[in-house]
Every structure is written in C-alpha cells, then in structure tokens.
C-alpha cells in the first residue's frame, strides 16, 4: 500500500521495492489511495506493477487499472481473448497483439 486510507501515512515504497528486488521478487504497489491525490511516478517508486480502482477517481465500481512494466506484461499470456487481442493464430504458436 502506497498511502494508508486510515492515517494518510505514505509508506516507504521505494525502499520496500528495493528490498523485494534484492530477493528476486516482483514489487506490486496498491495505489488506490495515492493515485487520486498525488502524482505517482512508477519509475521513481521502482515498482513492477501498480494497481488502483476506478471508483476512487469517481469512476464506475468494478473497474480499475493495472500498470505493469512492458517486459513483464508481455511475458504474461492474456487471461481473456478476443476483441483484436490475437495478432496471428496458428495451431501451436499464437501471436498476441502488442500492448496498447
């Protein structure tokens, strides 16, 4: 969690991310409370993924954003397919469309 919704404390995510990366892990930041109120620079934070919900930005419930580094997102196969997500279909080797 980047910022606490109870106390408003900004957690030391840059330091936490450094520690996670030292152990070979991926660093995922919950930006639900921070994104609507402060400028969040994912490069400065050093996170691999940042997630936040749309309703905190007066958007619809049930929607949100998952930002991720290109190389990590490209390594993940899509959970759902359709709507122009497949670039080329073959029997053994599908090619996914580029990230938006």
Language model features with spans:
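Pyridoxal 5′-phosphate
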Residues: 1-100
């Amino acid at each position: 969690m980047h910022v606490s919704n109870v106390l408003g404390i900004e957690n030391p995510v840059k330091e936490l991310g450094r520690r996670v990366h030292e152990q070979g892990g991926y660093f995922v930041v919950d930006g639900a409370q921070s994104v609507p109120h402060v400028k969040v620079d994912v490069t400065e934070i050093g996170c691999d993924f940042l997630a936040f919900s749309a309703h905190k930005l007066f958007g619809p419930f049930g929607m949100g954003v998952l930002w991720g580094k290109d190389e990590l997102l490209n390594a993940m196969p899509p959970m759902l397919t359709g709507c122009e997500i497949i670039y080329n279909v073959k029997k053994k080797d599908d090619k996914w469309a580029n990230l938006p």
